[in-house]
């Protein structure tokens, strides 16, 4: 295989351990023991000026005393000694290092130690795992670089597990024998080598089937996007547990590793664009990785489930309904074939309760599983039970699954109804046969959902070579004019914002800004009643200051409303034609310096904060993507009409959203943030009736 720039870090031929020790339970002792536990056959050098030999090997005073220059130096000393070791390594031309220490010093100078090391190493082309990390494992090289002892028996497989949390790094690799890895990394502070770099290395390894990430932030956005693009093209799923969703946890991320968690909507948009599977916790992560680390992918169709319990079948059906999960409709021929293998009193259906008695259990279940899964409407099969090591029925079930796997090419999995079963031996046996074990009914359903969603993503984007780019929806002069206006420090009024929307092809009502009764009279002569009056003074939320008057049906009503509003809030007022009542949404966008412009759609009007129902996507969108985004709102079902209210014109609404996304993509960083709230939707279209714009200058 062609050499990769990270091979020197993750697959070195020789390693020096600075701080090696014979003291029990020390970092120096643990890192040597872990290096040997999986059979690493490269050269190992121990460095400790107080020892001449260690574990029967020579022990050297420092890096300069070594008989040859190693590929990689593992730095297992306290923070105050790290810089000296790094300087020696750079002097000798060592190109990779792992730093366990935090590199925080009480009496540090500016720039701080982490910044000094990062600058020196980057300049010299040195790769660094850490600082403040727990190391990494490369099972294919028989190598563990670690600061603490960990269990033996690490399973090899197709999972690359990359974690910014040291605890998360060990949670899966040290405790779960269902999972097999080809890379496990605790990235730490990422002084040089980032999550994106590890992803890129893993995606070029032939054994990688899935990449799992535990992240607080992304420090190399361009590299991350490039890695996601590689994953998309190679059809390697990426599963992410992104923490820092809430304000409190984002603040904790800063104190933990100095990571800025970032706007969660931006990450949600990036994940959506590249088909990244976002999970909520470690249990869902483990189940999803286990399912993706199989050689098979789901066929067209839905889930086929088989049980040895009627009651727990009902549990599955209840949970499936909670998550909107569908089971495959079986063909009549499949039901007939199933019935031949079922004992009296059992009904051929999906999900299938198949136990009856223990007679001929192994062969009967093998036939039932294969028959169910081979139905044309079934995409994958899951057998749910409560196996435990040493339980006779569990052995029968495992054998049945393995037999069934030999007569179907569709993926199979065993799921437990309880996540704490004693099933380590069963898990390993099934894994060797390419069948994952998923712990817990809920986790099994969630993982299966990701598995099937990945199929849909691949189907939709298999022919695309790149993420969508903005189109020239208006003349270039319009874009240039508005970029110039947005760069002006003069505040952009609501009327300016609505005019901008209209210039880019979005529907907005007729309007005029007035500062006197005379101007109001002139304006309403050119507008259709009913009208709306809104204060044009500097209030972000007009409804909170009684700055909106609706449904004014005559000139007299408009004059009366203007007089009252001008007296309380000031004479500058926006008069607009009133859009017929409809469903209220909000279109918004933010510009992120790392990932670009993100469109956010949510329930609108005064309910925007109350409902917290929003979805995000990278701009721009085409009409199909816009419609798909709208369908993911919790309130989407209401748009189809309810209780006598007419359905919204979804095609028209999607066109408006797509047009908006094209506009913000074309304007780029000229707009820091924009909020159109509400967008009033009905059977005759969608209209923007309020617009707030923030520019780079920080003025409205």
Model-based region annotation:
Residues 1-700:
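Catalytic-core regions of core metabolic enzymes
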């Amino acid at each position: 295989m062609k050499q990769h720039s990270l091979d020197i870090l993750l697959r070195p031929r020789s390693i020096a351990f600075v701080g090696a020790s014979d003291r029990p339970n020390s970092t120096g002792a643990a890192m040597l023991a872990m290096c040997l536990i999986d059979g690493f056959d490269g050269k190992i050098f121990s460095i400790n000026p107080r020892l001449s030999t260690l574990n029967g090997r020579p022990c050297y005073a420092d890096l300069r005393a070594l008989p040859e220059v190693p590929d990689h130096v593992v730095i297992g000393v306290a923070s105050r000694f790290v810089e000296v070791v790094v300087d020696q390594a750079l002097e000798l031309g060592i190109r990779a290092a792992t730093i366990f220490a935090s590199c925080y010093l009480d009496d540090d100078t500016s720039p701080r130690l982490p910044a000094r090391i990062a600058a020196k190493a980057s300049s010299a082309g040195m790769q660094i795992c850490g600082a403040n990390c727990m190391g990494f494992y490369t099972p294919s090289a028989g190598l563990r670089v670690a600061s603490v002892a960990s269990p033996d028996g690490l399973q090899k497989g197709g999972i690359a597990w990359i974690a910014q949390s040291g605890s998360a790094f060990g949670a899966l690799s040290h405790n779960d024998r269902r999972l097999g890895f080809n890379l496990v990394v605790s990235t730490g502070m990422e002084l040089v080598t980032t999550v994106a770099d590890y992803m890129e290395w893993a995606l070029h390894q032939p054994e990688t089937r899935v990449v799992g990430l535990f992240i607080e932030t992304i420090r190399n956005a361009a590299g991350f996007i490039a890695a996601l693009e590689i994953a998309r093209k190679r059809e390697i799923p990426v599963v992410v547990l992104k923490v820092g969703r809430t304000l409190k946890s984002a603040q904790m991320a800063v104190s933990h590793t100095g990571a800025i968690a970032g706007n969660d909507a931006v990450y949600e948009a990036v994940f959506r664009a590249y088909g990244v599977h976002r999970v909520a916790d470690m249990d869902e992560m483990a189940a999803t990785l286990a399912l993706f680390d199989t050689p098979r992918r789901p066929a067209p169709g839905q889930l086929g489930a088989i049980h040895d319990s009627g009651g727990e079948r009902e549990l599955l059906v209840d949970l499936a309904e909670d998550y909107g999960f569908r089971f495959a409709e079986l063909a009549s021929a499949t039901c007939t074939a199933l019935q031949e293998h079922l004992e009296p009193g059992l009904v051929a259906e999906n999900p299938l309760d198949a136990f009856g008695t223990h007679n001929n259990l192994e062969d009967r279940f093998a036939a039932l599983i294969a028959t169910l899964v081979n139905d044309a409407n079934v995409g994958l099969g899951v057998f749910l039970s409560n196996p435990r090591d040493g339980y006779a029925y569990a052995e029968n079930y495992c054998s049945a699954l393995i037999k069934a796997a030999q007569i179907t090419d569709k993926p199979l999995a065993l799921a437990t109804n309880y996540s704490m079963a004693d099933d380590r031996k069963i898990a390993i046996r099934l894994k060797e046969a390419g069948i994952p074990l998923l712990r817990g009914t809920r986790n099994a359903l969630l993982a299966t959902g990701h598995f099937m969603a990945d199929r849909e993503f691949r189907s939709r984007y298999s022919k695309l070579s790149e993420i969508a780019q903005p189109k020239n929806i208006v003349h270039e002069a319009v874009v240039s004019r508005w970029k110039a206006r947005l760069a002006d420090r003069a505040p952009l009024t609501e009327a300016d914002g609505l005019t901008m929307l209209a210039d880019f092809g979005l529907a907005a009502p007729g309007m005029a800004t007035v500062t006197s009764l005379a101007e109001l009279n002139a304006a309403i002569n050119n507008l259709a009643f009913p009208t709306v009056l809104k204060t044009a003074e500097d209030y972000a939320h007009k409804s909170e200051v009684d700055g909106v008057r609706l449904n004014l049906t005559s000139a007299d009503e408009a004059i009366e409303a203007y007089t009252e509003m001008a007296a309380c809030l000031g004479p500058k007022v926006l008069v607009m034609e009133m859009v017929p009542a409809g469903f209220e949404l909000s279109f918004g966008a933010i510009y992120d310096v790392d990932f670009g412009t993100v469109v956010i759609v949510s329930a609108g009007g005064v309910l925007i904060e109350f409902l917290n129902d929003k979805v995000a996507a990278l701009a721009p969108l085409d009409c199909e993507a816009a419609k798909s985004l709208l369908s993911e709102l919790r309130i989407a079902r209401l748009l189809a009409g309810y209780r006598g209210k007419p359905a919204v014109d979804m095609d028209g609404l999607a066109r408006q959203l797509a047009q908006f996304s094209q506009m913000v993509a074309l304007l780029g960083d000229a707009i820091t943030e924009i909020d159109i709230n509400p967008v009033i939707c009905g059977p005759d279209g969608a209209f923007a009736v309020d617009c707030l714009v923030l520019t780079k200058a920080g003025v409205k």
